[in-house]
């Protein structure tokens, strides 16, 4: 009997800071499957080396649905410490 295969890693990087851009570069360079997400309030998003999404999720339920629909296995919150 073979062991179950682990789910492929897929990361949602919540960004908007210099640190998030650095993390995006590190994830891309490591070949990790990831998506960079800017909040909807972003006027001029900085290009990132990862696929990009812009906008909120519509609350906790919307975020949970996005995580399921996109098969996200890990979330990195690299938003600004005072973001609301």
Predicted regions and their residues:
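Short, structured coil segments at secondary-structure junctions
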Residues: 30, 47-50
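Glycine-rich, highly charged phosphate/nucleotide-binding loops
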Residues: 50-70
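Short, polar loop motifs at secondary-structure junctions
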Residues: 37-44
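A short, flexible N-terminal coil/short beta segment enriched in small residues
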Residues: 2-33
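Glycine/small-residue-rich loop that forms an oxyanion/phosphate-binding "nest" at active or ligand-binding sites
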Residues: 67-84
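N-terminal positively charged helical leader segments and presequences
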Residues: 13, 41, 52, 72-73
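Short, flexible loop segments at the rims of nucleotide/cofactor-binding pockets, characterized by
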Residues: 13, 51-56, 80-81
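Structural motif
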Residues: 14, 37, 77-78
């Amino acid at each position: 009997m073979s062991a179950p295969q682990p789910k492929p890693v897929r990361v949602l990087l919540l960004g908007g800071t210099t640190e998030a851009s650095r993390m995006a570069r590190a994830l891309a360079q490591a070949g990790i499957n990831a998506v960079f997400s800017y909040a909807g309030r972003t006027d001029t998003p900085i290009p990132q080396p990862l696929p990009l999404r812009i906008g909120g999720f519509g609350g906790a339920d919307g975020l949970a649905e996005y995580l399921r629909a996109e098969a996200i296995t890990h979330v990195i919150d690299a938003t600004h410490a005072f973001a609301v």
